[in-house]
């Protein structure tokens, strides 16, 4: 099923960009349903502190369609960064004052703004179609809102600032669901979490956790060997 829409978004500070499922390709329908039904505790055991503490941030979970079908936009953070250095992640970052209300339009604007700043994509070609519950990253104290997007009109992307971003790339969903690329990432602390072997790197941590849950609840997950473990470098 494919919907039809002429909706386009031109970002304006503190104005809520439209969030709509109109015009989505049929294969994204299961992901859109996840956004409307999933509970925070189904995505992660790390939830925002009840005290309200934590730095409000947002990431753009951007789905596109490439030569090998559905794909996700990802980036590798620069190895010199103070937090999450060298990790593969979604585009995103902390909310700025001009993004607006952290409990309303703020995460939507921040996700698009940060994606443009980090990858050079044109936000006008992105259709937002859902928002996942806010989650928490204890090591960096970020309260993160994953914003779901459809790359309706793809634009060139690159690592805009090499001091922050090492590279920008897309990964086919088929590679993420391939059991051969699935693993359990073992942190030196003893923490175990989902991992993906993609683009000659290990995708783990918060980003891997969100992808793992999306694949599961969208019904895209394939059986894989959960006993296969990859130890993380002690610096991770």
What are these model-predicted stretches?
Residues 160-197:
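NUDIX/MutT-family hydrolases
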Residues 1-90, 94-155, 176, 186, ...:
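N-terminal leader/linker segments that precede catalytic domains of diphosphate-processing enzymes
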